[in-house]
Swiss-Prot record:
This is Matrix protein. GO terms for cellular component: host cell plasma membrane; membrane; viral envelope. It is found in: Virion; Host cell membrane. InterPro entries: Matrix_C, Matrix_N, Matrix_Paramyxo_C, Matrix_Paramyxo_N. The gene is M. Homodimer. Dimerization is critical for virion formation. Interacts with host ANP32B.
Length: 335
């Protein structure tokens, strides 16, 4: 039995939206580089210099003899760094990077990035830029099938997204608890509805916001579980959720991310499941990569958040991450 509880819009009305990156071009048709700064926090961190950087650009042929042929639109997550430089200065250096892209494969298709340009202002992000990085291709590219293997490719930076980490404490991504299941427990999930306004160019505005498309995604927060072999009622779980005082915001971690902060009282069991942290971050890059790619340059706004209370999936139910399932004859074996 599923129970749904609606949060009041005051829980996200301050920082529940992200402005779009409106594409503008030079006279020759090239995109003008732009930077977008997002601050999903409450501003109670003493040091305001920590930020997460995310690059967007074009994967194109690296041919010095002719005009480059664009193959796909891609992204490069650089991670967290500490810098006092202006966003425009960071963008300028990023556009001058010589980033090589190579398509390869492991468990799934991958894209390899490495930079050949010396770093100055971007030194705090040298771990990704100088030692190279490998990403799941579908997470960082909108059309990896169009990237050739017989022609050298480069990643030309066009846009930069900076997320200021202004919240006091740590941004915890509780990965280990996301698949945790328990007998007689109630799973606490969130269903988030976004209204999306794709960046269609300057001066082009849809007058009626209701005409804009909406999309949903779901995240798992934790489980409410009693010590005895009894199950909490939905009304009791709703009361515990209300006491948590959850505040929501949208950030740019990995593209678009949902940030949650508990400003009230949290149950001891749930607090332990979340690593005793009250500031959480859920990147859509991990949750829903297709939706994340759609939101790379778009304006998006939270229009609804609902707490979804469901019975925890029984432990005897197996999670199948592989399309090959073992059979009794042993013809296929999942290693």
């Amino acid at each position: 039995m599923t129970e749904i509880y609606d949060f009041d819009k005051s829980a996200w009305d301050i920082k529940g939206s992200i402005a779009p990156i409106q594409p503008t071009t030079y006279s020759d048709g090239r995109l003008v580089p732009q930077v977008r700064v997002i601050d999903p926090g409450l501003g109670d961190r003493k040091d305001e210099c920590f930020m997460y950087m995310f690059l967007l650009g074009v994967v194109e042929d690296s041919d010095p003899l002719g005009p480059p042929i664009g193959r796909a639109f891609g992204s490069l997550p650089l991670g967290v760094g500490r810098s006092t430089a202006k966003p425009e200065e960071l963008l300028k250096e990023a556009t001058e990077l010589d980033i090589v892209v190579r398509r390869t494969a492991g468990l799934n298709e991958k894209l390899v990035f490495y930079n050949n340009t010396p770093l100055t202002l971007l030194t705090p992000w040298r771990k990704v830029l100088t030692t190279g990085s490998v990403f799941n291709a579908n997470q960082v590219c909108n059309a990896v099938n169009l990237i050739p293997l017989d022609t050298p490719q480069r990643f030309r930076v066009v846009y930069m997204s900076i997320t200021r980490l202004s919240d006091n404490g740590y941004y915890t991504v509780p990965r280990r608890m996301l698949e945790f299941r328990s007998v007689n427990a109630v799973a606490f999930n969130l269903l988030v509805t976004l209204r999306i306004d794709k960046a269609i160019g300057p001066g082009k505005i849809i007058d009626n916001a209701e005409q804009l498309p909406e999309a949903t995604f779901m995240v798992h927060i934790g489980n409410f579980r009693r010590k005895k072999s009894e199950v909490y009622s939905a009304d009791y779980c709703k009361m515990k959720i209300e006491k948590m005082g959850l505040v929501f915001a949208l950030g740019g971690i990995g593209g678009t991310s949902l940030h949650i902060r508990s400003t009230g009282k949290m149950s001891k069991t749930l607090h332990a499941q979340l690593g005793f942290k009250k500031t959480l971050c859920y990147p859509l890059m991990d949750i829903n990569e297709d939706l994340n790619r759609l939101l790379w340059r778009s304006r998006c706004k939270i229009v609804r958040i609902q707490a979804v209370l469901q019975p925890s999936v029984p432990q005897e139910f197996r999670i199948y991450d592989d399309v090959i399932i073992n059979d009794d004859q042993g013809l296929f074996k999942v290693l």
